[in-house]
Amino acid sequence: MAELQQLQQLQEFDIPTGREALRGNHSALLRVANYCEDNYLQATDKRKALEETMAFTTQALASVAYQVGNLAGHTLRMLDLQGAALRQVEAKMSTLGQMVNMHMEKVARREIGTLATVVRLPSNQKVIPPESLPSLTPYHRKPLNFACLDDIGHGVKDLSTQLSRTGTLSRKSIKAPATPVSATLGRPPRIPEPVQLPAVPDGKLSAASSASSLASAGSAEGASGIPQSKGQVAPATPPPPPVAPVTPPPPPLSAEVFLPPPPLEVSQPPLEAELPLPPPPALEGDELGLLPPPPPGFGPDEPSWVPASYLEKVVTLYPYTRQKDNELSFSEGTVICVTRRYSDGWCEGVSSEGTGFFPGNYVEPSC
């Protein structure tokens, strides 16, 4: 407490008083200097005036030196007291830190001891029955109801297999018969008619069979329209009958009605004599497409700047101007021998310009 009171007295009284005394001596010394100058100029005895001036000067210097020394001593004393106070605060903070560390170590040891404790469960609590069992609903047998499936799917019957057995052209064939085939009943061969989409009731063709019949009919007509050669004249195909709104079901099969034979392959018209291709025009010596020269550094002889060992050769895609002294500057198409790669994307290599670093996304491997 005494040190704190002394420090407070120095800061509030002694040091400000010494500073005010120095300011007062400054103004007093100015007045003494003016007096001595006037006295020396007006005095008849210059020797006596000079001695008087020297005495005033000695007294003023002694007074100023005393006041400066006193103020400096007070300032040093204040600094010493402040250093001692700071050391006390530092010691207290160190003590508090040690206490906190000790407390944390105690807590950690307590937790470690808690985790290391063996928990032994009593042997009589292996199975704990529930407090109340849920009530079970008695089973009642219910008949199956298939009416819930009425709105699922569609009820259209597929008769595509039956149509394939009743004289319809094969769906996989795209060829037409070369000669007309006479039917058993004396009528011209029947051209398959395009089938329209039937209604929903049973006994009609499905959408899939109708689409396939249309595709087969169109393919048969397209195949029959191939032009014949001059030596072979195919008979004209009769026009198809008008399309009925709804195609009637096919007639029932009997022993007297036979299916027409499968259509024969239509002979392709002989191709005209192929003329030989004209020879390519003769190229002059200056019109020959010579290969472009390889980039520098890819000749049979390696340049002198290529190092003895390197990872690979790369070609620059874009020009780059170095930002630091240890980087490379290059233009587009420059060949660089990579000697080292870094994880940040930069590479180190050697080019005809020198050795340095360059960004790895400016180059691509050479072919």
Swiss-Prot record:
Compartment(s): Cytoplasm
Presence of keyword Coiled coil: yes
InterPro entries membership: ABI, ABI3_SH3, Abl-interactor_HHR_dom, SH3-like_dom_sf, SH3_domain
Signal peptide range in chain numbering: none
Boundaries of every SH3 domain copy: 309-367
Pro residues compositional bias, start-end: 236-264
A Pfam family of this chain: Abi_HHR
Region feature (Disordered): 163-273
One cellular-component annotation, GO: dendritic spine
UniProt keyword list: Coiled coil, Cytoplasm, Phosphoprotein, SH3 domain
Lineage: superkingdom: Eukaryota
Positions where Phosphoserine occurs in the chain: S216, S219, S343
MF GO annotations: actin filament binding; identical protein binding
GO biological-process terms attached to the record: actin cytoskeleton organization; defense response to tumor cell; modification of postsynaptic actin cytoskeleton; negative regulation of lamellipodium assembly; negative regulation of protein localization to plasma membrane; positive regulation of cellular senescence; regulation of cell migration; regulation of dendritic spine morphogenesis
Coiled coil: 36-64
Low complexity: bias regions: 206-225
Subunit structure: May interact with PAK1 and PAK2. Probably interacts with TARSH.
Function: Inhibits ectopic tumor cell metastasis of SRD cells. In vitro, reduces cell motility.
Family: Belongs to the ABI family.
Name used for this protein in its record: ABI gene family member 3
Organism of origin: Mus musculus
